[in-house]
Regions:
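N-terminal helix-loop segment corresponding to the beta1-alpha1 unit
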Residues: 1-181, 187
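Mixed-charge, glycine-rich, non-catalytic linkers/tails in nucleic-acid processing enzymes
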Residues: 190-192
């Protein structure tokens, strides 16, 4: 669940206005994971801050009618939507690419998942959820790190999340450039 935040952080660092939509109450799970950085009375999770610099946050229940209305109002004026939720979850809410492109035909919609899900190119695992460690294990990278006499090892820093986030940000920039030439938005599909 870090590839989307990393991707959008890269866009924010490049000057984009990024609004991160978070679940009401708990927000992003990384908000509560140590280590914490404290300045005066304010205590923040270092990992959350590392992946969310230069962003605005909006607490929004996209499962409610009022939350969906606010979200769709934002989509009308957005250049890009980035999501890295379980495949199909936004479609169940009626907020997938097919719906959003009707509202904003110039929208660049980027979806990051474990195995990719571009229509016509789905593999047998396209609907399966995946975390960074799954992508690292299935790609073989875990076998290349660590020690010869030990079992495969996780790269710790989220290599698959970071790499897929970086590639997605690059894909979004290409899509924005293409939109300047054609006036059309598009779907950017990224697999970890």
């Amino acid at each position: 669940y870090m590839s989307g935040p990393y991707c959008s952080m890269l866009l924010a660092d490049a000057g984009a206005e990024v609004i991160k939509v978070e679940r009401p109450g708990s927000g992003d799970p990384r908000r509560s994971i140590p280590p914490f950085v404290q300045k005066g009375d304010i205590k923040k999770a270092g990992g959350f801050m590392a992946y969310n610099s230069n962003k605005k946050s909006l607490s929004l229940n996209i499962r409610s009618n009022s939350g969906q209305k606010i979200f769709l109002d934002l989509v009308k004026i957005a250049d890009v939507v980035v999501e890295n939720l379980r495949p199909g979850s936004v479609n169940k809410l009626g907020l997938g690419y097919e719906t959003l492109k009707e509202i904003n035909p110039k929208l660049i919609y980027a979806a990051i998942s474990g195995f990719g899900r571009l229509e016509g190119y789905e593999g047998p695992d396209s609907q399966r959820p995946a975390f960074d460690i799954v992508a690292e294990a299935m790609s073989g990278i875990m076998h290349l790190v660590g020690f010869e006499d030990k079992p495969p090892s996780w790269t710790i820093y989220g290599m698959a999340d970071i790499y897929s986030g970086m590639c997605t940000a690059y894909g979004i920039m290409q899509a924005l450039f293409m939109r300047e030439r054609t006036g059309k938005g598009q779907f950017v599909d990224s697999a970890m």
